[in-house]
Amino acid sequence: MASRGGSRGRGFGTGANRGGFSARGGRGGMQQSFGPPTTVLEMGSFMHACEGEMVCESINPKIPYFNAPIYLENKTPVGKVDEVLGPINQVYFTIKPQEGIVATSFKPGDKFYIGGDKLLPLEKFLPKPKPPPGVSKPKKAAGTGRGGVRGGRGGARGGRGAPRGRGGFGGRGGGGARGGRGGGFSSRGGPRGGSRGGFRGRG
């Protein structure tokens, strides 16, 4: 499942050093050799050329993978997504043209298209509400005998938080903060688990 594998990649940044939608986009880009997808969806409209690339405004409610192939309406490939820019409610992206495509040959308003399997829902990059303070109280009242196990799960939650940090469209926007909170939850989860484990040992 290419889309699922993509969504579990290591980042919504451009290139390896930018946080790695490159990992997902790279795998997606390899599929281009098998031809364009059966159907394509509107991804964005051309705004202007900059440094040899096409700068576009997104007209799709979802977020494109980095390195995702971009097409014209007739499925002619024109390049790949290079960067995703702007706040989550006003997304822009750039297209690195493939050989033979000139960025200045397009005019404002020209549409670009993408395969549906190269998109992620915006919700993946929105901050999640913090759990109510009372949620942790039942764990404390459950007894020390089970504290060690719960502490372990607290650590695991932090582990899941870390990929969100790596996987952030917010590496340059909002998602990075989520990752940070995920990491913070990990550190909090760790001491809670540790203290319970210690208390159990003393018991």
Curated annotation (Swiss-Prot):
Compartments reported by the entry: Nucleus, Nucleolus
This protein's UniProt keywords: Nucleus, Repeat, Ribonucleoprotein, Ribosome biogenesis, RNA-binding, rRNA processing
Residue ranges, annotated region (RGG-box 2): 146-198
Ranges of biased composition (kind: Gly residues): 1-29, 144-203
InterPro entries listed in its UniProt record: Gar1/Naf1_Cbf5-bd_sf, H/ACA_rnp_Gar1/Naf1, Transl_B-barrel_sf
Chain residue ranges for the region called Disordered: 1-32, 124-203
SUPFAM superfamilies: Translation proteins
Pfam families: Gar1 (PF04410)
GO molecular function annotations of the record: box H/ACA snoRNA binding
GO cellular component: a single term: box H/ACA snoRNP complex
Location of region: RGG-box 1: 4-29
Primary localisation category: nucleus
Domain of life the protein comes from: Eukaryota
GO biological process: snoRNA guided rRNA pseudouridine synthesis
Annotated PANTHER family: H_ACA RIBONUCLEOPROTEIN COMPLEX SUBUNIT 1, NUCLEOLAR PROTEIN FAMILY A MEMBER 1 SNORNP PROTEIN GAR1
Subunit structure: Component of the small nucleolar ribonucleoprotein particles containing H/ACA-type snoRNAs (H/ACA snoRNPs).
Family: Belongs to the GAR1 family.
Function: Non-catalytic component of the H/ACA small nucleolar ribonucleoprotein (H/ACA snoRNP), which catalyzes pseudouridylation of rRNA and is required for ribosome biogenesis. This involves the isomerization of uridine such that the ribose is subsequently attached to C5, instead of the normal N1. Pseudouridine ('psi') residues may serve to stabilize the conformation of rRNAs. The H/ACA snoRNP complex also mediates pseudouridylation of other types of RNAs. The H/ACA snoRNP complex mediates pseudouridylation at position 93 in U2 snRNA.
Protein name listed in UniProt: H/ACA ribonucleoprotein complex subunit GAR1
Species of provenance: Coccidioides immitis (strain RS)
